[in-house]
């Protein structure tokens, strides 16, 4: 079937990109460890191909926390009667590479919660439960808040958020999160 063939082709292209085989590797390019230092000077670089033979020459292994600021949103609390009424997203609004904004809920957010819970254009949102890892990039020209079952990933420097969206999609499609692979039923902050 055509849809299966398209999905397999997308997965193969992403697999090649993740492993540095989609385009030729240029030996004169800046090593990934130097790029990581520019993105996050405090990053701990655990290797630069020392023990990981599976990654391309010049690449390094890191964690999302070195590249993105990470937060989850606010838990719904009916006893909370203070703050500013704001629209917020739940996991039911987030689908693969899109948002369903037909039903957007509201709750009160205190001033000191807004920075942690607000999503801005370019943020990657990732579902913690349900369809674990389901993700989309917020591309609206207005800010919105999130509830606690959504992870907000905001890049610390200029990088391709879309690439990381595709990495999550690849991991999900290949049962490496939320499925048979590592069998996560939820995606906690630590696991992400």
PLM feature spans:
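Short coil/turn segments at secondary-structure boundaries
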Residues: 24-30, 47-50, 77-85, 103, ...
